[in-house]
Amino acid sequence: MGAMAEIQFIRGINEEVVPDVRLTRARDGSSGQAMFYFDNPKIVQEGNLEVTGMYMVDEEGEIVTRDVNAKFINGQPVAIEATYTMRSPQEWDRFIRFMDRYAASHGLGFQKSENS
């Protein structure tokens, strides 16, 4: 069994819905952003909106973003959007290592857009 990587909105509780992930990166590689979109995630289905952050957990430790927002339609939560901002090449590399593990353990077709 390979290394597991999980996304959690509450520490210790894995989110089962695999998100859409979009990546942007500065041309000079100094910074980047990852936008996560979870369509009807488990935490929303369970009516738990006490979300204070998104935790990306793997063998190296934990990456945390507090930029997490629920999306509502007709007053009902339907999705969660989270943004993780990377402010250095090291943070970018660390995030990519997490995403590679997450993609491998969750069957996510994760594509890095390479600028050639």
Curated annotation (Swiss-Prot):
It holds the Pfam family Psb28. The keyword Methyltransferase does not apply. InterPro entries: Psb28_c1_sf, PSII_Psb28_class-1. This is Photosystem II assembly factor Psb28 protein. Keywords: Membrane, Photosynthesis, Photosystem II, Thylakoid. It comes from Thermosynechococcus vestitus (strain NIES-2133 / IAM M-273 / BP-1). Signal peptide: none annotated. The keyword Thylakoid applies. It comes from the Bacteria. It is found in: Cellular thylakoid membrane. GO terms for cellular component: photosystem II oxygen evolving complex; plasma membrane-derived thylakoid membrane.
